[in-house]
A protein has these predicted regions:
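Beta-rich carbohydrate-recognition modules and glycan-binding surfaces
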Residues: 1-3, 7-179
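Ser/Thr/Asn(+Pro)-rich, low-complexity disordered segments
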Residues: 1-22, 30, 54, 173-573
């Protein structure tokens, strides 16, 4: 199976005017498909042309000049301690017997001349090198084997166009050999590894994107989901990581977040580290829903790992929140506070769905007697966005029930199934001739836009939606039966490059011609937890996340807002 290091496509508005003399446009991404950085090198690097979906290096008139590109294989190039071991290229915390192996390198090139490929250590020592003669004509794939045992500390992979050559490059890949562990386990493994690449043990936080510097823009909600996914990955019947590692992650993150300044108890959505202190990132908010996601995650992880003291401290954090200060005139809780920690945001959690449910449950932990106002448009997610109907079920089993909930009268399981049916039908109805309809892709949800420079929310209620966020496939996977249907879809996605070994792409257009390879922390969290629930259901394993929810008296008491008769033994049964 091939994992792109980088496919050199560029997204730009076709009406954009290119200034005379421009040789390189900014790629719509500034990162590799591995979630790392890249750059240019050589005395003729400024002659490299990148104006379309290929790199062009014309050196036929420069017999003494060379130029090319380097790509970090693990972390940022400036982080020498992060390297790739070709015998186990996923993060080293993942068990060796579950890791893939890198056994080949492939480059797609055209033109005439000589091309050199090198793999180097962090110290710049050449660990592997090959010369490729490009003999003219159209693009061709050049595949070269590598010995994984000789590449245990690889830091960069570099291609260089040699003097006197005219060569074009459209992509660079690593050939992977994967253990035979089953499609359901593979989906969780790849999704968890993607999330783990976003995590920094140095800070205790998950980066919003894997390729950015640790501490520059970290996400609190995804950090909580990472801790929970790690607790799930450490369960004996899964065994991706050790229980000791999961406990260390839990303890480190709890300590790191415990040092944050809050706003009336609310945690920041995003944080950054400056002068050794981590605090809210300017221009972002103290967020009710992101606090809820983090705190639900940490409470469940503490119970799963037998760290009751942590679980109790998480409950205490919730009880210290000043919920009356967050309440809007209509009775709903606000989305939070501005970064000054004082100014209340005017919009509140009143739309029906998983986000509002988690916020309400958080308040009920603090005040068991509170009765929030009814949600707006019960049973109907805003815009028909997929993730809204599934978020709550990443944490709690109760919403697998078709009993009308006591708060809004919603039959959650039916609503979730109806959403899945609408998502699956949308492409064939709106885009019947598309690749998405042909391959059975779906996922009108939320995430980065197609350019990777802004947030996008789609949904089945909107016409002509042409951007798919496939995290919804894994979030809703446990709803589909038989499980083999999901398996076949995952196989098709793997074949089309939408679910490579590094995890699902962030988004893809309905025609299948454009996708965003960004490794983002939030959707990686959604994917990992969704894949875990799918794995346990497909194999009939105990779902440790759901069992922890059932064992928590605080969560059981809070859940009576929706299901007064639900006990710890029958939730979601």
């Amino acid at each position: 199976m091939w994992q792109p290091v980088q496919e050199y496509f560029i997204h730009r508005d076709q009406a954009q005017q290119i200034a005379a003399g421009t040789k390189r446009l900014n790629s719509f991404t500034t990162y590799t498909h591995l979630g790392t950085d890249f750059g240019f090198h050589g005395p003729a690097e400024h002659e490299i042309v990148w104006l379309s979906d290929e790199i062009v290096v014309n050196l036929s008139q420069q017999p003494d000049a060379w130029a090319g590109m380097w790509h970090s294989l693990a972390g940022r190039a400036a982080s020498p301690l992060e390297v790739m071991d070709f015998t186990r290229p996923y993060p080293p915390e993942i068990a060796a017997h579950l890791q893939p192996r890198v056994s080949a390198v492939m480059i797609e090139a055209a033109g005439r001349g000589r091309l050199k490929i090198e793999i180097k250590s962090a110290a710049g020592e050449v660990r592997w090198t090959q010369l490729i003669d490009v003999a003219g004509g159209g693009y061709g794939m050049f595949v070269r084997p590598v010995d994984p045992e000789t590449l245990r500390d690889a830091k960069t992979i570099i291609w260089t166009v040699e003097p006197g050559s005219d060569v074009k490059i459209s992509g660079l890949w690593l050939g992977m050999e994967r253990p035979q562990i089953g499609f359901d386990a593979q989906a969780f493994l790849a999704s968890y590894a993607k999330l783990l690449r976003c995590y920094s043990a140095e800070t205790g936080y998950v980066r919003d994107r894997a390729h950015i510097e640790a501490g520059a823009f970290d996400t609190v909600s995804a950090t909580g989901m990472f801790v929970l996914a790690t607790a799930a990955a450490s369960q004996q019947d899964v065994g991706l990581v050790t229980a000791n590692y999961a406990r260390n992650v839990l303890l480190q993150t709890h300590a790191a977040v415990g040092r944050l300044k809050t706003a009336h108890g609310l945690l920041p959505h995003f944080v950054r580290r400056q002068d050794g202190v981590t605090q809210i990132h300017p221009g972002t908010e103290y967020s009710t829903v992101d606090s809820a996601i983090y705190l639900h995650s940490m409470l469940l992880a503490g119970i799963m790992l037998g760290e009751q003291a942590i679980a109790d401290e998480v409950v205490a954090m919730v009880k210290r929140m000043d919920f009356p200060r967050m309440r809007l005139p209509g009775g709903h809780l606000s989305h939070g506070f501005l970064d000054d920690g004082v100014t209340l945001l005017r919009n509140g959690w009143q739309d029906w769905g998983g986000e509002t449910a988690l916020v309400m449950l958080m308040e009920r932990i603090a005040d068991p007697g509170c009765l929030p106002p009814r949600m707006r448009r019960p049973g109907h997610a805003w815009q028909g966005a997929g993730f809204i109907t599934e978020l709550q079920s990443l944490f709690h089993p109760d919403f697998d029930s078709d009993e009308p909930d006591a708060h809004d009268g919603v039959r959650w399981l039916s609503v979730r199934r109806d959403m899945l049916a609408a998502q699956r039908a949308y492409m064939s109805e709106q885009w019947p001739a598309s690749a998405a309809a042909r391959e059975g892709l779906y996922g009108l949800s939320a995430g980065e836009n197609r350019f990777g420079n802004g947030y996008w929310v789609g949904g089945v209620d909107l016409p002509s939606q042409d951007l798919i966020h496939p995290h919804y496939i894994l979030m809703s996977a446990a709803l589909r039966s038989p499980a083999e249907e999901v398996a076949e879809l995952i196989r098709r996605m793997e074949k089309s490059g939408l679910f490579p070994p590094w995890g699902m792409v962030e988004n893809v257009t309905v025609d299948g011609k454009s996708y965003l390879p960004m490794e983002g922390g939030l959707n990686a969290g959604f994917e990992a937890l969704g894949a875990y629930h799918f794995l346990t259901k497909a194999r009939g394993l105990p779902d440790a996340v759901y069992e922890a929810s059932r064992r928590s008296p605080h969560l059981r008491q809070a859940m009576r807002l929706f299901y007064p008769g639900t006990s710890g033994q029958d939730a979601g049964q």
